[in-house]
Curated annotation (Swiss-Prot):
It comes from the Bacteria. Keywords: Cell membrane, Membrane, Plasmid. Involved in the post-translational modification of the lantibiotic epidermin. NCBIfam families: thiopep_ocin. It is found in: Cell membrane. This is Epidermin biosynthesis protein EpiB. The gene is epiB. It comes from Staphylococcus epidermidis. It holds the Pfam family Lant_dehydr_N. GO terms for cellular component: plasma membrane. Its main location: membrane.
């Protein structure tokens, strides 16, 4: 196995506060003594700090009664007890975390809960209520610094803002638009000088001779309310004690400061209390905080587990990293997100390779594309050998085992470059001790939620209170690895933070600063300015460029925040940053996933996927006893007695012989319509407690990505260009070729014959729908002369063809993409030549597939333009990701070499394919002129321009079809290689 990942030396262990013994001895019983359990102070405080309403209900319940309210409270407490003894995911005092280290032996000894520590800070919801209050009163923010919101977009003397945080409590969904007047310009300029709000009010009053400063304060407050400006009273997400930060930022004379200091002191006292001893102190703090602001949540609590030893075998780490590599090989071959891939196509069509576009301009609805439209999609794989193993496992009542030979075959058949594997990642796995798997004394179960996008993300919010030595060791590893990655590729890594749309997400977004720079959206202290960020494109991806650093920039998150819940800008930056990355995903095999049962899938002592059963409400009828029906299902599918039910991100261990547990399952099934049941390993191990570890992994090879030249050009509007008449013709892709032959070509011919136009060209395109872009040019640019003619033709097509819509749009020439304003007219002449050639190829029949005809035409074009060998190689590098289907090309290689031999004006081509020969030489003077044009000084390299010609020719003939285009380039590559050794002459 050529494993590309190496594990960290450090892991995070996550474990529930109680041991498995609680579940086994008490929670399987039908008669749980809740009075006895509630005498446990840790349990009581845990309930209070996570679900206060449930805590309040406890004192009002008569446990002897059997009414609905009592049953509901008992059920809720049971679920909490199960979670606190069997689920490791950190949450309040229910479970906690610690750092461990891989070594020679397994040795985990968790201390008694009295040694564990709490880390307590104010909850994000209450925090942002406080910040909103402070930013709403000049008295509090007058001494703070003025911060201009870098997301403000200024265009045509107007200011636009399309993102706002939850601090303002502004539910605005539409784009803010205000006039960018002289006062806003003045504020913008002065905000760069680190001035306070008090100084700003004075400056505005003096500049505009406003005697009444209260008027200025009201105006400034309106700007804050709209988040055009804000203050540095906002704590950054890397601040470990946001309340103390605010206290230290305020004038100590403010009356509120004393109250905040009191709350802070009480929180400190509460943090130092042993678990289970802080019930009344917590209530006192909540009372103090609620007197200021009422909130659903007041405090965020994380628990740190103390231990005497925390070590696991290095061999376990190595096998986990191998399992991650196998999962990567088995993951669907999709890169990044489909949303960004679609956006890349739009970008390429308008801007091409050879210019950078300012980020805010590109995302503007006013003069850019706006944000990408979300595309719902799901991916699964068709893995033949898994299907075979599935059938054998079912037949033999066993599991699916992936062997070393299977891995070798996966590697052999892998078509994705290791360059596209994640630079780093994290894998979540439950750890069990015991010899359940032959030959091993331990085993790991990969979590259904595999891990994170990058090493350190899961650790982010916790790192402030970890073991210092281990924490520093981990951060040193991450920084070293990413420094290597940055140096290999000449790029900058920056940490991305955001004041979120939902204030509760602050708790997840809190993190630790690792990288040299950060971009803080809606927050102060940002090292990166959005105005400095540009977007560029290669043939297969978009990338971000920092003008300040003169390099590509990649944004990473050091938290487990789901970027889907971020602002549109946050999502866009994250999605582009992992564009062209194939991530590790859970095993999804389209054939097996559709079945109600999947056996365990295992590699060595790593369970890649536990045995899984799918239950849905349609399996039950109202006339049949539910418990009897479930018993039948359980017997039929051999579902064990102890299982984990999974619904969404939630998981709960249940015993299927216990009626109370079955009631929980029944309710969840009714609520969600379907649930998954996973096998549990609680009875197959000798664990004293549930253990889950987070293992950071680093890619040890293939860090160097394909290099490319970042263009110097910045997108701008050019004057004095020809004014073309541009039409979009909406027509389904399957009918476009017929439409071009039967309607478009006769129309163009008539326009030309009557001297209504001088030039034309067309492009096939797809946005929300398929359409054809038609461009027409008159030298006098007076299109009123032909409008009625065009309208009549359009009406005729609407009645008689598959054309169903029509629009007149602006045409913006891709000046940078094709060499500059001084050559664009000659390039547009070539577009007409290429359009005529493409139409002729579309409407003609050939004795070889049209991909080969197009490849021949491309070879002809490059030879005629005298494109040299190195430029041809560059064209292939820039435009073809991986050349393929060589077996399909082999039988034509000799014929292709003959047909592309230029001897005697391509006499062999003329003999074998006379029509194609005629098409290529029709209007050959345009190519003669183009050859001279491409000798000039150009904004863009010749190879890039030719690459765009090739792309557009494939587009005109095949439509948007990357696979056909890739095949055409593969054929062209084979022609080039063959002609190195044989010119096609017998």
């Amino acid at each position: 196995m050529d494993n590309i990942f190496v594990p960290s030396n450090i892991y995070m262990v996550r474990t529930p506060i109680f041991s498995i013994e609680l579940y086994n001895q008490f929670l399987k019983s039908d008669n749980i003594d809740y009075d006895l359990i509630l005498q446990n102070d840790i349990f009581k405080e845990s309930i209070m700090t996570t679900t206060y309403n449930l805590y309040q209900s406890i004192g009002k319940i008569d446990w002897e009664k059997d009414n609905k309210k009592t049953r509901n409270v008992k059920e809720s407490l049971l679920k909490y007890l199960i979670r606190m003894s069997t689920r490791s995911t950190p949450y309040g005092m229910l479970s906690g975390v610690a750092l461990g280290e891989f070594s020679e032996n397994n040795n985990i000894k968790i201390k008694d809960s009295s040694f564990h520590k709490k880390d307590v800070k104010i909850d994000g919801q209450w925090l942002y209520k406080l910040v909103h209050y402070l930013e709403s009163d000049y008295t509090y923010y007058k001494d703070s610094f003025v911060i201009w919101n870098q997301q403000n977009y200024i265009y045509n003397n107007r200011l636009y803002l399309d993102n706002n945080s939850s601090i303002t409590e502004n539910k605005r969904n539409d784009v803010l638009s205000v006039k960018y007047n002289s006062i806003l310009v003045f504020i913008h300029e002065n905000s760069k000088k680190n001035i306070t709000y008090e100084e700003l009010v004075q400056l505005i009053s003096s500049k505009y001779s406003i005697e009444n400063k209260e008027e200025v304060k009201v105006f400034v407050q309106e700007l804050i309310n709209k988040e055009i400006i804000f203050s540095d009273l906002r704590p950054t997400l890397e601040n470990k004690n946001p309340l103390d930060y605010i206290i230290n930022s305020l004038n100590p004379k403010n009356s509120l400061v004393g109250t905040l200091i009191n709350i802070s002191n009480e929180i400190t006292k509460y943090s130092k209390m042993p678990l289970g001893k802080g019930e009344y102190k917590y209530l006192d703090i909540v009372n103090l905080m609620s007197q200021l602001f009422v909130s659903k949540n007041y405090l965020q609590i994380d628990t740190y587990i103390d231990y005497s030893r925390n070590e696991l075998k290095q061999s376990l780490a190595d096998n986990i990293s191998e399992a991650a590599y196998i999962l990567w090989l088995l993951s669907p071959n999709h890169f990044g997100t489909k949303t960004i891939r679609n956006y890349h196509e739009f970008f390429m069509d308008k801007y091409g390779f050879e210019q950078l576009v300012n980020l805010k301009q590109l995302l503007s609805d006013i003069n850019g594309f706006g944000y990408p439209k979300k595309d719902s999609y799901s991916f699964s794989n068709n893995i033949a050998f898994l299907k075979e193993k599935y059938l054998l496992a079912i037949q033999n009542n066993s599991h699916i085992e992936i062997t070393e030979n299977d891995v070798k075959n996966l590697e052999k058949n892998n078509t994705v470059s290791k360059i596209n594997a994640p630079v780093s990642t994290e894998i979540y796995s439950e750890i069990y001790f015991g010899n359940s798997i032959k030959g091993y004394e331990d085993f790991a179960v990969i979590s259904p939620i595999l891990g994170s996008f990058n090493a350190g993300a899961t650790f982010g919010r916790f790192t402030g209170n970890f073991n210092i030595k281990k924490k520093n060791q981990l951060q040193k590893e991450i920084v070293h690895h990413y420094n290597n990655y940055m140096n290999e590729n000449g790029l900058e890594i920056s940490q991305l933070n955001e004041g979120p749309l939902n204030s509760r997400n602050v708790n997840i977004l809190n993190n630790n600063r690792i990288y040299n720079t950060c971009l803080n959206l809606n927050l102060p202290k940002s090292d990166i300015d959005i105005n400095d960020i540009f977007i560029g494109a290669t043939f297969n991806k978009l990338y971000l460029y920092s003008e300040k650093h003169d390099s590509r920039i990649v944004f990473v998150s050091n938290s487990m925040f789901n970027y889907e819940f971020g602002s549109e800008l946050y999502k866009f930056l994250r999605e582009i940053s992992f564009e062209k990355t194939k991530f590790i995903q859970p095993i999804t095999e389209e054939g097996i996933d559709s079945l109600p049962f999947c056996p365990r899938i295992i590699y060595k002592n790593i369970i890649l996927k536990p045995a899984t059963w799918k239950i849905n409400s349609e399996m039950f009828s109202e006339t049949e006893n539910w418990l009897n029906r479930f018993a039948t299902i359980r017997e039929k599918w051999h579902i064990p007695k102890d299982v984990i039910i999974a619904f969404g991100d939630n998981r709960l261990l249940l015993n299927l012989l216990n009626d109370k547990h079955l009631i929980i399952l029944k309710k969840e099934l009714k609520k969600h319509g379907r649930i998954r049941i996973l096998e549990s390993f609680i009875n197959e191990s000798n664990n004293e407690r549930m253990l889950e570890i987070v293992t950071p992994l680093y890619k040890k090879t293939s860090l160097k990505e394909q290099s490319f030249i970042i263009p110097k050009n910045r997108n701008k509007h050019f004057n004095n260009l020809k004014d073309w008449f541009s039409i979009h013709l909406s027509i389904p892709k399957t009918y476009q070729d017929n439409f071009i032959q039967d309607y478009l070509l006769p129309f163009i011919t008539e326009l030309k014959v009557n001297n209504f136009i001088n030039k034309f060209f067309y492009i096939k395109f797809k946005e929300d729908e398929d359409f054809i872009k038609l461009r027409l040019l008159r030298e006098d640019e007076d299109y009123s002369q032909i409008y009625s003619f065009i309208k009549n033709w359009k009406d005729y097509c609407l009645l008689n063809s598959e054309l169903y819509d029509y629009s007149i749009v602006d045409y913006v020439p891709e000046v940078y993409r094709y060499g500059g304003p001084h050559v664009i007219e000659d390039i547009e002449n070539f577009f007409m030549y290429d359009s005529l050639l493409s139409i002729n190829i579309i409407q003609s029949e050939f004795k070889i597939p049209k991909e080969f005809i197009v490849a021949i035409s491309i070879d002809f074009l490059l030879d005629y333009l005298e494109i040299n060998k190195s430029e041809k190689e560059e064209i292939l590098i820039n435009n073809a990701e991986d050349l393929y289907r060589s077996n399909d090309i082999r039988e034509y290689k000799n014929l292709l070499a003959k047909l592309t031999n230029p001897k005697n004006d391509y006499e062999i081509l003329k003999k074998e394919f006379p029509n194609l020969h005629e098409f290529l030489f029709n209007k050959i003077s345009i190519l003669e002129n183009l050859k001279k044009t491409l000798q000039k000084s150009l904004y863009t390299s010749r190879s890039r321009i030719i690459g765009s010609f090739i792309h557009m020719r494939c587009n005109r003939i095949f439509g948007i079809n990357p696979e056909k285009e890739k095949f055409v380039l593969s054929i062209f590559n084979e022609i080039t290689k063959t002609k190195k050794y044989w010119d096609g002459c017998d």
